[in-house]
Amino acid sequence: MKRFFLDYNERQIVHAAVRIDSRRQRKQSAFTRKASDAIAKAKDGLDVGDISPDVRSVIVEKIYQSIAYGQAWEYLGETFCNRGQFYQYRKQFCFLVADNMGLIDNRRRKQQGKGG
């Protein structure tokens, strides 16, 4: 399984982007539009294995809810995956958001692709 690592600043930017996206306002800044696009692409690109689309959408929304509202896996209800898998998917989701926002450079993208 691949390891997805973000440094502290990248993680803070991604979490802020998700929180801003969860509280959409009428006026959108360039950052907000970029974040919304990156989040939509990350939701589509998240690899949660070969499961039904209904279950996949629940997992993706629980990950989004976990980041947006700071909720732990234990308080999210039925997530259709165990705790370890959930947090691995969450890391992957954050990495995809950061990558889609342009925070990840090519060198790090290649390192992540090697797995670990």
Regions found by a protein language model. Give the residues of each.
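N-terminal interaction/assembly modules
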Residues: 1-53, 106-116
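Amphipathic alpha-helical interface surfaces
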Residues: 35-38, 59, 89
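Short amphipathic alpha helix immediately N-terminal
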Residues: 51-71
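Helix-turn-helix DNA-binding module
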Residues: 69-82
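Short, solvent-exposed secondary-structure capping/transition elements
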Residues: 72-75, 99, 106
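DNA major-groove recognition helices of helix-turn-helix
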Residues: 86-100, 104
